[in-house]
Amino acid sequence: MTCKKMKLLKVYVSSTDRINHVLLYEIIAKKAKDFGIAGATAARAMLGYGPSSILRDTRFFELVEKYPVIMEMVDTPEKIDQFLEKELLPFLENQPKGCMVYTFDVDVYLAKMGDTKIKKCQCEE
C-alpha cells in the first residue's frame, strides 16, 4: 500500500474567541490558506474541557454558545513547521485567548479531489 508522509497540525480554540470581532478559528483558517497550507478544517467538538476544567457540552448549546472548536491542517512536515514558526505561533502567543496547538506525523493514503482524478502517493522512508 502506498502513502505520503505528511504532518497534521491541530489547534483547539473556543467557538466564542474573537480578535477584532472576527472568530479566531476563521482567522487561523485564513492564515493557513494565505500561507499555502494544503488543507484545513474547523469542526465543533461534542464535549471537552481545557485548563479551566470547565466541561463544555453541545447538548445545551441553546443556552451556552461556547464550545470547543478543533482546527486541523495537513501538509508536508516542512510546510507545517514553517507555518507554525513564522505565522501561527507568533500570532497565537500574542493573543489573550487560550488554545492548544500540537502536531503529529500522518500517512496520507488518498488525497482525491471531487472528480475522478486520484493522486497516488508513494511512501518516503
Where would I find each of the regions flagged by the language model?
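Positively charged, small/polar-rich N-terminal and surface patches that mediate targeting and assembly
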Residues: 1-125
